[in-house]
Amino acid sequence: MCTAGKDITCKAAVAWEPHKPLSLETITVAPPKAHEVRIKILASGICGSDSSVLKEIIPSKFPVILGHEAVGVVESIGAGVTCVKPGDKVIPLFVPQCGSCRACKSSNSNFCEKNDMGAKTGLMADMTSRFTCRGKPIYNLVGTSTFTEYTVVADIAVAKIDPKAPLESCLIGCGFATGYGAAVNTAKVTPGSTCAVFGLGGVGFSAIVGCKAAGASRIIGVGTHKDKFPKAIELGATECLNPKDYDKPIYEVICEKTNGGVDYAVECAGRIETMMNALQSTYCGSGVTVVLGLASPNERLPLDPLLLLTGRSLKGSVFGGFKGEEVSRLVDDYMKKKINVNFLVSTKLTLDQINKAFELLSSGQGVRSIMIY
């Protein structure tokens, strides 16, 4: 039965309030308006950022449908949409690409000004929602909201991919691209260099893969879960360190082991202390640190300017510096086995098991859970 132009009733995991489990609900998804795309979600990953919203580390309005790392099929399109058509396989983009703002026109940034990461409206461009539940509008997350069987996104926030792409390609929508790109695009790791990756979760593992792909000769994985060390070594880390094993700051240990510090550090843990350790673990004259983790909005880096004055640099990175137009190439590379994302998948669940996925994430078990719809 054709559903284009009609409301769709489907299942979704709704976060009614912070610090509470998600609730599996029946919601209504309105048809896409002009320059919008309605997508049938096939699979979605569970990212630490989703958990950070629930913990109020990332500000959001409630009730909200979380999720931003997915793959799906276009169900219908609104007026004026030319980039995709019904039936196309796509990845929603939490960092859109309008093509006309300063960031989109620059080769130095991928942070499109039409993103909803800063505005925090939780609404579409016309300031309304496409989701309703129990008679109430439900907010979206960064313009994507993938913990639902159907979602609506702007046409600038969708990447068409190979129709044969496996469901695991959903991880290119955030986790893999974020870590991998931080190494190859943002840090610009060079052949023969030394690297340290702080935080051995999905993003950290992807950063290790990126460092290895860029030709780093030494990659130090840093984490407190020793059960993650074998996977880190398998992916390219040359050694792993647990800060709890030392009676001195881990940056001092790393500097002692690397003749004054590594060339590049990537921070994926989201803790102020870890960010400072990452920065101080780099060589004073030229070290580059990339911060990916999200700390509490009430916390600030206690930064001594002297750490930067000598030549270090501190950078941030979102979605690994990739623009939306590059996502299809990443999927193609994955299908050609030039890159691999399968190592991220530790558990496959269904939408009604979503709270179990969050429990696994919070406990540090596994790497990444994906939900198959």
UniProtKB/Swiss-Prot annotation:
InterPro entries to which the protein is assigned, alphabetical: ADH-like_C, ADH-like_N, ADH_Zn_CS, GroES-like_sf, NAD(P)-bd_dom_sf
One matching Pfam family: ADH_zinc_N
Cofactor note: Binds 2 Zn(2+) ions per subunit.
Essential cofactor(s): Zn(2+)
The family this protein is said to belong to: Belongs to the zinc-containing alcohol dehydrogenase family. Class-IV subfamily.
Signal sequence, renumbered to the chain: none
Organism annotation: Pelophylax perezi (Perez's frog)
Top EC class of this enzyme: oxidoreductase
Binding site for Zn(2+) 2: 98, 101, 104, 112
Highest taxon of source: Eukaryota
Catalytic activity from the UniProt record: a primary alcohol + NADP(+) = an aldehyde + NADPH + H(+)
SUPFAM superfamilies in the cross-refs: GroES-like, NAD(P)-binding Rossmann-fold domains
Gene: ADH8
Gene3D superfamilies per UniProt: Medium-chain alcohol dehydrogenases, catalytic domain (3.90.180.10), NAD(P)-binding Rossmann-like Domain (3.40.50.720)
One term under GO cellular component: cytosol
GO biological process, one term: retinol metabolic process
Binding positions (Zn(2+) 1): 47, 68, 174
Molecular function per GO: alcohol dehydrogenase (NADP+) activity; all-trans-retinol dehydrogenase (NAD+) activity; zinc ion binding
PROSITE patterns in the record: ADH_ZINC
Subunit structure: Homodimer.
Residues modified to N-acetylcysteine: 2
Protein name: NADP-dependent alcohol dehydrogenase
EC number: 1.1.1.2
Keyword terms, alphabetized: Acetylation, Metal-binding, NADP, Oxidoreductase, Zinc
